[in-house]
């Protein structure tokens, strides 16, 4: 059995002000995304955005992630609780962010920003997609430090006892998601971007691979107590929300493949 490290969720306290690791992980992901996107804007001739515009894009994306992630969590996962405890909606440091809500928020942010600068929405998504897994991985580390979103009870050597998960060892599903949704997904997308490839290949890969990784990792993650298993006595809310991403990613990849076969797909 693995040992849970018991990291203090508060990274730094200045008088009454507490700075949580959870928030720092989001800031780290946003900063890394800004840095790499700015770098790519300088070296990629097809970039739909100028280096000096990356800061504004980062601001739009950060708002989309925070607002969309929080609103998505409230709507998708715990609406009755927040309906009766509305003040808790603003306690982001206690956790409670939805990737799928954040993804919708980012799509809205992309649409608004693309319209502002006169860029193509899909080109912008293709350009930014390779750096998104960094933020996803950082967020999962924040979940792990918070001791939340732990996995199912297990007798596997990979199990560990979480402070809020009861006395039995559980899968560290946050670390599984960090590895597959963060490290592996970033590595695959970044390697694909090194060489010329069909336009929108990376966008399709991101949506398809993230959806698959999340769907699989959900089998190790403890279902949300307010929902449990929704369909077939095994399908969770996270899996249901991942299916549209898998399907849309597959549609994009098939379209790219067909255009490539017909030599109608531009390489970038």
From Swiss-Prot:
Disulfide bonds, which pairs?
none
Task: Please provide the record's keywords in A-Z order.
Answer: Cell inner membrane, Cell membrane, Membrane, Transferase, Transmembrane, Transmembrane helix
Query: What pathway does the annotation place this protein in?
Result: Protein modification; lipoprotein biosynthesis (diacylglyceryl transfer)
Protein localization? Cell inner membrane
Pfam families according to UniProt: LGT
| PROSITE patterns per the UniProt record, alphabetical | LGT (PS01311)
The record gives the membrane topology as:
Multi-pass membrane protein
Q: Which GO terms describe its cellular component?
A: plasma membrane
The portions of this protein that span the membrane are: 14-34, 57-77, 90-110, 117-137, 174-194, 200-220, 238-258
Molecular function (GO) terms for this protein are: phosphatidylglycerol-prolipoprotein diacylglyceryl transferase activity
Q: Which InterPro entries match?
A: Lgt
Task of the protein: Catalyzes the transfer of the diacylglyceryl group from phosphatidylglycerol to the sulfhydryl group of the N-terminal cysteine of a prolipoprotein, the first step in the formation of mature lipoproteins.
Return the similarity comment.
Belongs to the Lgt family.
PANTHER family the UniProt entry points to: PHOSPHATIDYLGLYCEROL--PROLIPOPROTEIN DIACYLGLYCERYL TRANSFERASE (PTHR30589:SF0), PROLIPOPROTEIN DIACYLGLYCERYL TRANSFERASE (PTHR30589)
Q: What is the protein's given name?
A: Phosphatidylglycerol--prolipoprotein diacylglyceryl transferase
The organism's lineage?
Bacteria, Pseudomonadati, Pseudomonadota, Gammaproteobacteria, Thiotrichales
């Amino acid at each position: 059995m693995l040992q849970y490290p018991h990291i203090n969720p508060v990274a730094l306290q200045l008088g009454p002000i507490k700075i949580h690791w959870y928030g720092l992980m989001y800031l780290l992901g946003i900063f890394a995304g800004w840095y790499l996107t700015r770098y790519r804007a300088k070296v990629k001739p097809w970039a739909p955005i100028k280096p000096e515009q990356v800061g504004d894009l980062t601001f739009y994306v950060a708002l989309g992630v925070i607002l969309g992630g929080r609103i998505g969590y409230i709507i998708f996962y715990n609406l009755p609780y927040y309906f009766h405890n509305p003040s808790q909606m603003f306690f982001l440091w206690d956790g409670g962010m939805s990737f799928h809500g954040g993804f919708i928020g980012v799509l809205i942010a992309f649409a608004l920003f693309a319209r502002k600068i006169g860029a193509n929405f899909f080109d912008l998504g293709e350009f930014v997609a390779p750096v998104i897994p960094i933020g996803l991985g950082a967020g999962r580390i924040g979940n792990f430090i918070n001791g939340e979103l732990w996995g199912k009870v297990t007798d596997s050597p990979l199990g560990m006892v979480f402070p809020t998960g009861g006395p039995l060892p559980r899968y560290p599903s946050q670390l599984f998601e960090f590895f597959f949704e963060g490290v592996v997904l970033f590595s695959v997308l970044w390697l694909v971007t090194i060489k010329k490839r069909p336009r929108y290949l990376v966008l399709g890969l991101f949506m398809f691979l993230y959806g698959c990784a999340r769907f699989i990792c959900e089998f190790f993650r403890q279902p949300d107590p307010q929902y449990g298993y929704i369909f077939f006595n095994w399908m969770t809310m996270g899996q249901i929300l991942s299916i549209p991403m898998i399907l849309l990613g597959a549609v994009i990849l098939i379209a790219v493949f067909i255009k490539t076969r017909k030599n109608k797909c531009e390489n970038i």
